[in-house]
From Swiss-Prot:
Assigned protein family: Belongs to the NadD family.
InterPro entries per the UniProt record, alphabetical: Cyt_trans-like, NadD/NMNAT, Rossmann-like_a/b/a_fold
Transmembrane domains' residue ranges: none
Top enzyme category: transferase
PANTHER family: NICOTINATE-NUCLEOTIDE ADENYLYLTRANSFERASE-RELATED, PHOSPHOPANTETHEINE ADENYLYLTRANSFERASE
Keyword Secreted applies: no
Organism field: Nitratiruptor sp. (strain SB155-2)
Known function: Catalyzes the reversible adenylation of nicotinate mononucleotide (NaMN) to nicotinic acid adenine dinucleotide (NaAD).
Name of the molecule in the record: Probable nicotinate-nucleotide adenylyltransferase
UniProt KW keywords: ATP-binding, NAD, Nucleotide-binding, Nucleotidyltransferase, Pyridine nucleotide biosynthesis, Transferase
Keyword Signal found: no
Amino acid sequence: MKIAIFGGSFDPPHKGHIAIVKRALEELDIDYVIIVPTYLNPFKTSFQASPSLRLRWLRKIFLPYNRVKICDYEVRKGRPTYAIETVEFLRRKYAPKKLYYIIGSDNLPTLHKWHKYQKLSHLVQFVVATRKGYKVPKKYKMIEVHEDISSTELRIHPKKRYLPPIVAEEIIRFYRS
């Protein structure tokens, strides 16, 4: 089995995340994309939508995708979880022949600061989803995504056109309340 892990806060999930998953399924030689919402990103101090709410939104959004799995491993831990922990858990669970780890190009400048980065880089092949304004070194596999949407901006100004229709109204109500 070959899998790609796509971790993130998904606070909120948006059409850019869907575009990344679709491109990964089209361009990578994989059986599944496993989406792993964080409980709390180790580089952040808080979240706005609760982990369980973000998990529920992701399950609704990706229900029609038979090659996408939503993994609640980090949410169940109830604490910030390092990528290396999640990778080791998923390696034990699936024993994949190939393991990709999808990151946004905005994560590249701090990737070397990730916990046990050297070990992690030997266990996975990083795939970088491009975003405007970030250069991607040739050593990384790349997925081009043209939807330049920011979860940070959507928390401040939720806009329906950037949100998955199945959860758009719920997300807008949540962030406007």
